[in-house]
UniProtKB/Swiss-Prot annotation:
Reactions performed catalytically: dihydroxyacetone + ATP = dihydroxyacetone phosphate + ADP + H(+); D-glyceraldehyde + ATP = D-glyceraldehyde 3-phosphate + ADP + H(+)
GO annotations of cellular component type: cytosol
Annotated pathway: Polyol metabolism; glycerol fermentation; glycerone phosphate from glycerol (oxidative route): step 2/2
Family: Belongs to the dihydroxyacetone kinase (DAK) family.
Chain intervals for the UniProt region annotation (Disordered): 40-59
UniProt: ATP binding residues: D413, G414, D415, C416, T459, S460, T511, L512, D572, P573, G574
UniProt protein name: Dihydroxyacetone kinase 2
Active site per database record: H223
Keyword annotations of the record: ATP-binding, Glycerol metabolism, Kinase, Nucleotide-binding, Transferase
One Pfam family linked to the record: Dak1
Amino acid sequence: MSHKQFKSDGNIVTPYLLGLARSNPGLTVIKHDRVVFRTASAPNSGNPPKVSLVSGGGSGHEPTHAGFVGEGALDAIAAGAIFASPSTKQIYSAIKAVESPKGTLIIVKNYTGDIIHFGLAAERAKAAGMKVELVAVGDDVSVGKKKGSLVGRRGLGATVLVHKIAGAAASHGLELAEVAEVAQSVVDNSVTIAASLDHCTVPGHKPEAILGENEYEIGMGIHNESGTYKSSPLPSISELVSQMLPLLLDEDEDRSYVKFEPKEDVVLMVNNMGGMSNLELGYAAEVISEQLIDKYQIVPKRTITGAFITALNGPGFGITLMNASKAGGDILKYFDYPTTASGWNQMYHSAKDWEVLAKGQVPTAPSLKTLRNEKGSGVKADYDTFAKILLAGIAKINEVEPKVTWYDTIAGDGDCGTTLVSGGEALEEAIKNHTLRLEDAALGIEDIAYMVEDSMGGTSGGLYSIYLSALAQGVRDSGDKELTAETFKKASNVALDALYKYTRARPGYRTLIDALQPFVEALKAGKGPRAAAQAAYDGAEKTRKMDALVGRASYVAKEELRKLDSEGGLPDPGAVGLAALLDGFVTAAGY
C-alpha cells in the first residue's frame, strides 16, 4: 500500500465536517466544538419530541461518526482529533444541541478515553436535569475474556449497527429506557474480528510500515493498535477468512461471546477499514458468506458491505456478526428502517432539505460557551510563582516529548507526547495573555483543568482534567487563606480519590497512575515534594516490567512491549510524561 499523503495544515477535521454538511442537507455544524447535529432534532425545530441519540469519538473512522447523523439514526455527534476522544465540553455541546424532553441516549465505543469523557458529559447533563442513559459498545473478540476482564471488549463494527438500529427504535417513538435496551441487545449479541496487511498512515505523522512485506495481522484495532498475532506468508482471502471465522464462532470458553445456531436470523457486516478496493471487499464478502453457509450452516438474513467504521487508509477488513434472533424484538425491522445518514446504504432527502444549501452556505450554529466558576475560593496564590512553576513543567514535557511519542508509537497510537505538548502550548498562551486566574489557587487550577480538557483530548486529557477539577475543589474546601504545601498535599489526596471513580486503573496496571499515586502517597506521608517527585519517577520506571491491563496498550501483544529490553523494558508513556511534568514543577518550586 502507499504510505504517501497529501500535505495539510493539520486541521482537517473541522473542514471535513463542514464538507459533509455541505453535501448532506439537514445537518448543522458547531465549528468550535466540532459537533454535527441533525437540524430537525434541535429543541427549537418545532418537530415532535423523540429520544435523541448522541455519539462520537476520535476522527479517522469516517464515515463513523458524523456520517451516521440523520433521520432514523443519530441526532448529534462530537468529533475529537484523529484517534483522540472529544472533550467533555464538546460532548456536552452535542447533548445540548439535540436536548429532548424524552431524554438522550449516549452511544460510546468502549475505549478508556471515550468512556471517561462521555461518562463525565452524561453526569453533567444529569446534574443539569436532563434524562440521560449511556450504552458502551464492545464487540471485539480478538482479546479473550480473561485478558479483557478489566477493560472489556473494544468497540468496533457493531457501533454502526447500534447507531442504525437504536436510531430507528427512537424514530418509532420508544421511550429512553426502551431505546437503551434495544441498543444494549445489539451490543450483547454482536461479535467482530478484523485483519489487515499493515497499519494506517496518520495525517501529519511520518509514514512507517509496521508489518513486513509478506506479513499480515489478525485482531487489528481501529487506532493502529497491534493485533492478536502476525503471520506470514500472505494468505488468500479464502485462507484468511477461514482463520477469522473460528474466532467469531468457535465455542472456545475464553472467546465465545455470542452463540450462533443454524436457522437463526444473522446480520453480516463486512467492513472496509479504509484501504481495500471495492472489488476486493465484495470478493471477501462473498467468500465469508460461502464459508458461513458451508461450514457453519449460517445463512445471513441481511448482508451489508462497505466502509462503515474505518482506520483511515487501513488495508484490511472486519467481519461483524449480529444474532438478530437472540437480540429479539423488532431488530430486523429497525435495521431495515430507512435513514438519511450518508454512512448507510439508503438515503433520502426532500427538495425542502436541499433549499437550505441553495444559498451557498453550510448551516452553522454558535458554540456552547464554557461557564467558568466566578466565585473566588479565598485561597491566595502568588501569580508569578504559580506561572513560573507551570512553565517549568511545560518545559520538561517539551524535553521528553520525542521519547514519550516513541514509546507510545510502540505501545499505543503514538499521540501521548504530542497531546501533552498541546496542553502545554495552550497553557503557555494563556499565561502570556494573562487569562489564567492564578492569584486564586482554586480558580487557577480550575482554569487549567478547562484548558487541558479543551486542548489535550484523548484519555490522558480526560484523566488530567478530572484530577485537576477535583484538586481545585480540594483546595477550595480547605478553608486556608493561602496555598501552602500542606494545602496541596491534602487536596492531592482528595483528587486521587475522585479520579478513581472514573478509571479502573490502579498501581501496577501500567498507566500514568503508576507515577501519580506514588507522588500523592509520598506527600501524604510527609516526605516532601522532592521525594514525591522521585517516587513518581521510580513508579514510571517500574512500568517497564509490567503488563498493561487497561487502555489501548492492553490490546498490544507482549512481544511488542518488550522491544526496549535494552533499556530495561518499555515504560508507560503517560507515566513517563507525568513524572517529567512533576519534576519540573517541584524543581521550579525550589525543592
